[in-house]
Design a protein with these regions (language model features):
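Short amphipathic recognition helices of helix-turn-helix/homeodomain-type DNA-binding modules
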Residues: 60-66
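DNA major-groove recognition helix of helix-turn-helix/homeodomain DNA-binding modules
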Residues: 44-60
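Residue-level signal for the short linker/turn that defines the boundary of a DNA-recognition helix
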Residues: 15-16, 41-44
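A short, Lys/Arg-rich alpha-helix, primarily the initiator
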Residues: 1-15, 19, 23
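Recognition helix of helix-turn-helix/homeodomain-like DNA-binding domains
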Residues: 25-41
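Alpha-helical residues within the helix-turn-helix
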Residues: 22, 33, 51
Length: 66
């Protein structure tokens, strides 16, 4: 499942998915695969993204990741 709300948040904060991937320390392939729903996120991935995207409200986490 593609994550359109997640992609929007990434673009709003980092301007490109590539810049977000660089900031989080992921390969370009992993970043695009996660954002496009081709790779499942681990709990660690979600935790890293929440920190970088300033997400701390459970409702917002639900919108971004589930």
């Amino acid at each position: 499942m593609p994550y359109s709300y997640l992609r929007g948040r990434i673009i709003a904060m980092f301007h490109t998915v590539k810049a977000f991937g660089k900031a989080i320390g992921w390969s370009q392939r992993k970043t695009y695969d996660i954002v496009n729903g081709r790779q499942e996120m681990t709990g660690k991935d979600i935790d890293q993204m929440c920190k970088l995207l300033n997400v701390d409200v459970p409702e917002e986490m639900r919108l971004l990741f589930f």
